[in-house]
Amino acid sequence: MTRKKDSKYNGYIMMLRRDQVGTRMTELVKQIMDNGSEADQQVLEQVLTGLAQKPAKQQTYINLLFGFETEFTSDGLAMTMPVTSLVHNTLGIVHGGVITTLADTAMGTLANKMVPEGQAAVTTEIQVHFFKEAAGSRLVCKCSVLHKGRQTMVFESKVYREDGIMCGHSTGSFFIVPKKN
């Protein structure tokens, strides 16, 4: 086959795959809407809403999936997230890994805001301590800088329930690296 024919053939195969995926997605959504619980349907809506916002926002899938909202403050950053069935563990409470992800994302967002142009910050270590159940309908993570050096940064974050009670505390170390294009 010539290169032009290869390209046309590959485009046709991709279109067929897209149609198959679209059909499968439609079947899965219908199955959840027909047989799923209300919580299943809410999780599906949250996932699809996050994905629908992806092209319009320069955010990660994690931010969109969990509904993270960021506000830079005079002393750092506050990141909030809704508490939904998507983030519950088998006990029906917020999974510790999700709280850790919230803290890491908040600290990483602040770290990447602070690095010089052409550089990025990556997590090298994170410690998390849980104090209370993360109850309520929203969590807020407040983070601040403990140390900013030429090659490393250290941050502290505190995760609060909507009633103001701290449910988690973490520190994170970040290494400054060249940004990949």
State each model region's role.
Residues 2-140, 146-181:
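Terminal targeting signals and extreme-terminal segments of soluble enzymes
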